Amino acid sequence: MPSTVASIRDYSNIPKSKREEIANGPGLEDFIVKSPTSLNTLFIYYSNFSLPLPPWLKTTIPTSNSYNKLNKDLRNLKLHTVCEEARCPNIGECWGGESGTATATIMVLGDTCTRGCRFCSVKTARKPPPPDPDEPVNTAIALAQWGLDYVVLTSVDRDDLSDGGSNHFAETVKEIKKRNLSMLVETLTPDFRGDKAAIATVVNAGVDVYAHNVETVKNLQWLVRDPRANYEQSLEVLSYAKIVNPNLVTKTSIMLGLGETDESILQTMKDLRSIDVDCITLGQYMQPTRYHIKVKEYVTPAKFQHWEKVGNELGFAYTASGPLVRSSYKAGEFYLKNLVHKRNKTNGSD
């Protein structure tokens, strides 16, 4: 009698339609891992039990004039933000904080992702609508209206596009710089399937900070991220961006509260420093809907302070660590802007 594993690996009798479905990537049904060795782990992460929200994670409903204006401008120009799509808890503060300066992170390439990471609430499809050709110009117009000096551009994954959307990304950066050369641009990119040409296209467009998130520690990648993403590939993306432009500021982010150990967090931070990543942010994972991975632990503010200290000791130029910190949270704050200006002067471009 053939073993169960052998039967699972035999694709010769799978219908053509099913083989195409597998090749195109996972749908929601594929998130149910059927391996017997994974059942106990999956029960922990997908059970109906939810941890009560601690007081330090409760935020206010956004109602400021700055928030309302930014929201209206986005709708009029048909733009998307990761702040909304990912249900970020900081949207009220970033869009209309005490300073009155909007710091929304613009999401290009549409609002539909070709991947289905188990922590993310952005909608998914195997073949999303084509990118809006007017989006680069509309994004630049909106940013010029807001009068910002620092902006974060991010995107969904677009595995359906031959270049992963890198040229669209680059065009958006160029349109922004065309209207305001002094504006600092941070790009938070997907992994582009590890395509070095795509990474170089974005870097060479004139970005000031190149960010790509490893999201979680190595041993939890399979549980948290889409199967097409992996730890080593993310490290290679960050490493190659630095090879293309050694003076480029590189940045990444890790979510905590998914069941990671202190040892695995420390090793991840060491791995990132080994490839000269400059900036790191650490924040609490928040379950966006009941269909996503459950929170395993609400990490205390004191523990986040510990990791900020560790980051500084390891040599990161900038470490932001806190329960509500996200990869683009207060990205344009004073220290990071100064770091970028310093690198630009070293490169002779400031």
From Swiss-Prot:
Record-level Gene Ontology MF annotations: 4 iron, 4 sulfur cluster binding; lipoate synthase activity; metal ion binding
The annotation note on the cofactor reads: Binds 2 [4Fe-4S] clusters per subunit. One cluster is coordinated with 3 cysteines and an exchangeable S-adenosyl-L-methionine.
Q: Which reaction does it catalyse?
A: [[Fe-S] cluster scaffold protein carrying a second [4Fe-4S](2+) cluster] + N(6)-octanoyl-L-lysyl-[protein] + 2 oxidized [2Fe-2S]-[ferredoxin] + 2 S-adenosyl-L-methionine + 4 H(+) = [[Fe-S] cluster scaffold protein] + N(6)-[(R)-dihydrolipoyl]-L-lysyl-[protein] + 4 Fe(3+) + 2 hydrogen sulfide + 2 5'-deoxyadenosine + 2 L-methionine + 2 reduced [2Fe-2S]-[ferredoxin]
Q: What is its EC number?
A: 2.8.1.8
- Which segments of the protein form a coiled coil according to its record? none
Residue positions binding [4Fe-4S] cluster 2: 113, 117, 120
Q: Known PROSITE patterns for this protein? A: RADICAL_SAM
State a GO cellular component annotated for this protein: mitochondrion
Q: Which residues bind [4Fe-4S] cluster 1?
A: 83, 88, 94, 328
Query: What keywords were assigned to this record?
Result: 4Fe-4S, Iron, Iron-sulfur, Metal-binding, Mitochondrion, S-adenosyl-L-methionine, Transferase
Asked if the keyword Disulfide bond belongs to this entry, the reply reads: no
Residue span(s) of domain Radical SAM core: 96-317
Q: Where in the cell is it found?
A: Mitochondrion
Q: Which cofactor does it need?
A: [4Fe-4S] cluster
In terms of superkingdom, the source organism counts as Eukaryota
According to its UniProt record, where is this protein mainly located? mitochondrion
Pathway in which this enzyme or protein is active:
Protein modification; protein lipoylation via endogenous pathway; protein N(6)-(lipoyl)lysine from octanoyl-[acyl-carrier-protein]: step 2/2
GO BP terms = lipoate biosynthetic process
The miscellaneous annotation reads: This protein may be expected to contain an N-terminal transit peptide but none has been predicted.
Q: What HAMAP family does the record tag this protein with? A: Lipoyl_synth
Q: Which family does it belong to?
A: Belongs to the radical SAM superfamily. Lipoyl synthase family.
Q: What is this protein called?
A: Lipoyl synthase, mitochondrial
